């Protein structure tokens, strides 16, 4: 396995960005934002949940504390591709992420009831999570194309752009590829700003000048809500997700 960061503690702010806004950001970022380790990649995730979707239902209520478990790869995996099993928690607006790396086949076996390839504090936390949430199982596949940047003058500041966000609930095996139904309009991407403290003044100014405002958006949550609407309305397949100027999602 390659070297990787296993723990994160930071604020994460999300923004839904149009193509025009993205172009303006690209110009503003050119002098100081550079690609990170993964640069451009297709990220594939399997989110785990209980049969009644207890985790995502609670998350959508926006409680003070919430958590989720996912399996992640940075390309369509083979058996020996590096994969990450991650617990992501949010408490009082701070995000805590803890993850362990292993091969994709090892991750599948582990999450199917096996033992972690190596024991650690993080693996014990994941073991507890799997034990606590009875019946937890693969629930949804979410994939997207990511551009990941960091500030060369303030390396702890990271900005990611996720486009082509797609989801599926069948064939929950990342080795099957990244196909799925698209979640957002084609000209909209999700930008996330990840930083240990407050947003730098220069970045806040860029966001303000381009009328880019934070929003509450969860890929898994939005896909789950879409799934519910589809299951309740046979006509939903012809509807389109729209986003207003505040970043709120509605269908029409």
Residue ranges of predicted features:
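Phosphate-end processing signature that detects enzymes handling 5′-triphosphorylated RNA
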Residues: 1-252
């Amino acid at each position: 396995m390659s070297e990787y960061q296993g723990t994160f503690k930071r604020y994460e702010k999300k923004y839904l960005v149009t193509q025009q806004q993205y172009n303006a950001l690209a110009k503003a970022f050119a002098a100081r934002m550079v690609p990170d380790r993964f640069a451009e990649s297709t990220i594939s995730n399997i989110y785990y949940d209980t049969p009644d979707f207890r985790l995502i239902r609670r998350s959508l209520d926006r409680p003070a504390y919430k958590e989720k478990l996912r399996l992640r790869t940075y390309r369509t995996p083979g058996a020996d591709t590096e994969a990450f099993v991650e617990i992501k928690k949010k408490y009082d607006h701070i995000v805590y992420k803890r993850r362990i790396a292993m091969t994709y086949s090892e991750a599948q076996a582990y999450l199917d009831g096996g033992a972690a390839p190596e024991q650690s504090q993080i693996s014990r936390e994941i073991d507890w999570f799997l034990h606590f949430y009875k019946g937890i199982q693969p629930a949804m596949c979410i994939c997207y194309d990511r551009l990941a940047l960091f500030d060369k003058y303030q390396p702890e500041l990271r900005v990611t752009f996720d486009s082509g966000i797609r989801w599926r609930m069948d064939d929950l095996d990342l080795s099957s590829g990244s196909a799925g139904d698209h979640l957002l309009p084609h000209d909209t991407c999700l930008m996330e700003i990840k930083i240990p403290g407050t947003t730098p003044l220069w970045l806040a100014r860029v966001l303000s000048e381009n009328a880019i405002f934070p929003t509450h958006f969860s890929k898994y949550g939005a896909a789950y809500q879409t799934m519910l609407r589809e299951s309740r309305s046979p006509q939903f397949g012809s509807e389109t997700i729209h986003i207003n100027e505040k970043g709120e999602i509605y269908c029409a």
